[in-house]
Curated annotation (Swiss-Prot):
The keyword NAD does not apply. This is Probable G-protein coupled receptor 33. The chain crosses the membrane at residues 31-53, 65-86, 104-124, 144-165, 210-230, 247-268, 284-303. GO terms for molecular function: complement receptor activity; G protein-coupled receptor activity. Glycans are attached at residues 5, 12, 19, 272. The gene is GPR33. PROSITE patterns: G_PROTEIN_RECEP_F1_2. One of its GO terms (cellular component) is plasma membrane. GO terms for biological process: complement receptor mediated signaling pathway; inflammatory response; phospholipase C-activating G protein-coupled receptor signaling pathway; positive regulation of cytosolic calcium ion concentration. Residues 1-30, 87-103, 166-209, 269-283 are extracellular. It comes from Pan troglodytes (Chimpanzee). Residues 54-64, 125-143, 231-246, 304-333 are cytoplasmic. Orphan receptor; could be a chemoattractant receptor. The keyword Ribosomal protein does not apply. Keywords: Cell membrane, Disulfide bond, G-protein coupled receptor, Glycoprotein, Membrane, Receptor, Transducer, Transmembrane, Transmembrane helix.
Length: 333
């Protein structure tokens, strides 16, 4: 999801401006920009509607609280995409200033980490609810979930601070301004010593981001849902296959949406093949930007309760506004 300048959406570790987008053909840039604009428009509308449903149309439970903040992380990201698309159409020229360069990069980093962490938290919640029902009955409360939510946001913010610090605007000799990472935090962009230091810090950031932002959460999700699926099948807790569909949706969507991003970031460190970088960049933009649209829809509609409540909520929006009795049926998942 790296789109800030050169589609460096969500904490670009190296600078796609230098390393990849300089190879992009105009058609590729247009594809990326259109993907961002479309994702922003549709994602803002759908995610905003989902947030409304979860906040005002459903009973506040652990489940709805976790999903609310998961979708909130998507919503925050979609609000910034138009700026990234505009920069892409302007050949990665950044005309929004250094402060917004830092804020956007930090915000997008925050959105990536929070979405990944909340997916893991939802998996752990399913695990505890299914395999430790007694403990869950005693401790699994909205207040407990609120502490989890707070911990996720604090952890994601802490991991995003380096990318807020490293991000700077750079003026080249032609007067072009780019928003890119300066890992050495030095104004001496050409020094070999500084370039070596930047490379070392870049590698360290990539490894930590890959481990904490993908590999570890992926294993947590796989472990939790595998255990849940085994227990559900063993006890025949559900006659429907819907719970298994939800589990598979979580695993597949996580892998499909985030694996291309980390592959592209790894390639930036190991290859200069322009075609390969271009293809992986486009794939990264498509999967991560549309992730903000389709992942919330999948999670809300695959689950039967979410689907029912969502349908009722659409019809009840105007009724709850204009009718004297504004109560709306709420369902607890």
């Amino acid at each position: 999801m790296d789109l800030i300048n050169s589609t460096d959406y969500l904490i670009n570790a190296s600078t796609l401006v230098r390393n990849s987008t300089q190879f992009l053909a105009p058609a590729s840039k247009m594809i990326i920009a259109l993907s961002l604009y479309i994702s922003s428009i549709i994602g803002t509308i759908t995610n905003g509607l989902y947030l409304w449903v979860l906040r005002f149309k459903m009973k506040q439970t652990v489940n709805t609280l976790l999903f609310f903040h998961l979708i909130l992380s998507y919503f925050i990201s979609t609000m910034i995409l138009p700026f990234m698309a505009t920069s892409q159409l302007q050949d990665n020229h950044w005309n929004f200033g250094t402060a917004l360069c830092k804020v956007f990069n930090g915000t997008l980093s925050l959105g990536m980490f929070t979405s990944v962490f909340f997916l893991s938290a939802i998996g752990l919640d399913r695990y505890l609810l299914t395999l430790h029902p007694v403990w869950s009955q005693q401790h699994r409360t909205p207040r407990w979930a609120s502490s989890i939510v707070l911990g996720v946001w604090i952890s994601a913010a802490a991991l995003s601070i380096p990318y807020l610090i490293f991000r700077q605007t750079h003026h080249d000799r032609k007067g072009k301004v780019t928003c890119q990472n300066n890992y050495a935090v030095s104004t001496n962009w050409e020094s070999k010593e500084m370039q070596a230091l930047r490379q070392w810090i870049h590698v360290a950031c990539f490894i930590s981001r890959f481990l904490l932002g993908f590999l570890l959460p992926f294993f947590i999700i796989i472990f939790c849902y595998e255990r849940v699926a085994s227990k559900v099948k063993e006890r025949s807790l559900f006659k429907s296959s819907k719970p298994f569909k939800v589990m598979m949706t979580a695993i597949i969507s996580f892998f499909v949406c985030w694996m291309p991003y980390h592959i592209h970031q790894g390639l930036l460190l190991t290859t200069n093949q322009s075609l390969l970088l271009e293809l992986t960049l486009i794939l990264t933009v498509l999967t991560t930007s549309f992730n903000t649209i389709f992942s919330p829809t999948l999670y809300l509609f695959v689950g039967e309760n979410f689907k029912k409540v969502f349908k009722k909520s659409i019809l009840a929006l105007f009724e709850s506004t204009f009718s004297e009795d504004s109560s709306v049926e709420r369902t607890q998942t």
